[in-house]
């Protein structure tokens, strides 16, 4: 099932560097040598894109000393070229015949980039649709009520210049079309019907609880802080993030649902 995630990005971002499999392929790997690796480092690693992030009981003065010791002599090198922006999305529908026990399906659409003001709303919407909790819309519709899928999930990835929303599930071959219809039915409900005040409040509190728990993983917190500073030149406190989530209205969610869950703009990849 992991392969379908890579190949779905290839379908969505066809012809763009984002579509390239992060593991590469045997031909490219065989062609690697010292010169090509050094050239890659020179083209992609720059001092203006470096952040030192730490979490825990670390003396800040000692951290500065260590940073200066190992990075103080680094030559200043600024990024010269930006990545080509992806702007030629064409929805695709691909069926791949595979000898698998189940059918595997990916569905999705472009979403908001990391700088977009609707990003936080999209995070909440994704959590409602198929996030970590057992009460997500798709988990209830396909797994709990119908028993059609053991694993169904949605994801939202925000890049610097584009974003991707996707849904994945595996199901028995004979249930594939019914499962797809149920997913599209949930999308339609979210496009047409506002969440009630109580529903929205529960969804907001659930997401905030997940964020609070995630801060207990110190490595993830360290990486999140570093990424935030690199992208936004600041690090929001958990309380600030919570205020942004609490400010989301039913109309905000409805608007984002109509932008991202548009069935005519959905791409689909099926292994069957």
For every predicted segment, state its role.
Residues 1-79, 95, 105, 112, ...:
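Charge-rich, well-structured scaffold segments of protease-associated domains
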Residues 35, 88-89:
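Short gly/ser/thr-rich secondary-structure transition/capping motifs
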Residues 86, 119:
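Double-stranded RNA-binding/processing signature
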Residues 91-101, 105-108, 117:
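Phosphate/diphosphate-binding glycine-rich loops and adjacent basic-rich segments that engage nucleotide
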